[in-house]
Amino acid sequence: MGISGLIPLLREAQHPGHIKDFSGQTVGIDSYIWLYKGAFACASDLALNQPTTKYVSFFLTRARMLRHYGVEPLFVFDGGPLPSKLGTELERQRARAERRQQGIKLWNQSKRKKAFEQFQRCVEVTPLMAKTVIEELKREGFRYIVAPYEADAQLAYLESQGVISAAISEDSDLIVFGCRTIIFKLDQFGAATIFDRALILRDKDIGGWSDAQIRRMCILSGCDYVPSVPGVGLKRAHRYVSRSCDLRSAVQLMRNDKLAVPEGYDENVERAELTFRYQRVYDPRSRALAFVTPLDESAPPLADMPFIGVDLEQRVAHGIAVAELDPVSYLPFAQIVV
């Protein structure tokens, strides 16, 4: 998830903190992070299709903790699959299916500990599980939004619009999307590590870099939208970005170094950058879709960017956002048979 090694790399921009530091403020939460943590505890039940609400209890305990410290939470849930991540998602689904079968085999052999380890590795949070949590959040008066696509893009948009002051997550993609304040490693007692984008200036290697340069370094090091060229991590990507003016020229430097750059890589990294810049998100004020950052004169025609997410009519976008419509099928949840 996210950019491997990015959070340790930006340690100069982080400091210890506590959730009470955000008392009186609205903070967004990457909700699937908590859903997955809760699901790990009941992985066997989920893998064996046994009824369970343990993940709901875990989620609500964390939600109440935020309220206890005076924080107004805004829970943001992932929506439908993004075209840019189709390859990544298909590979993850294949791996989960294999691990589930391995786990069931071990379970039937009474090797419960090993089976549980496999079940934890194949945990998948579904829109119906998110819907179950949302219904409980509604009962307790918590606010929420289901993103049309990715929660991290939605959180970045909400922060840029002043709807939230910070975002709680474990996903370093939020940094690439441009979030200014991120609460990482939040524990059950409220302690956390706070990322402050303004403190990047302390970093001797990228202190003077623009957001675009940081984004390009992360893309070249490998992200969910495009894998890296073999042998290229953050350190080497930093070198190529520092010596180039855009992604194509950075990729040409890789070719000059005789790296195994695959065919079409130039186009793939540019699509990744456009996805980070213009992914579709939900605007709660207009109740319609928007872009994570506004389109500018450098943006290609929308017809050339299907990978940023399908445009949804206002009725569908709002229905997804308020958890009335399934974000994958667009059907009302009431019509979905479990």
Name these PLM-found stretches.
Residues 2-16, 21-150, 154-158:
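Noncatalytic, basic helical substrate-engagement surface that gates or grips nucleic-acid strands
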Residues 18-23, 205-338:
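Non-catalytic nucleic-acid-binding/docking modules located in mid-to-C-terminal regions
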Residues 30, 195-199, 313:
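Helix N-cap / beta->alpha transition motif
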Residues 98-99, 107-109, 199-201, 260-264, ...:
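Short, intrinsically disordered/low-complexity patches at protein termini
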Residues 109-121, 182-192, 265-278:
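Hydrophobic transmembrane alpha-helix bundles
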Residues 123-266:
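Nuclease catalytic cores that cleave nucleic-acid phosphodiester bonds
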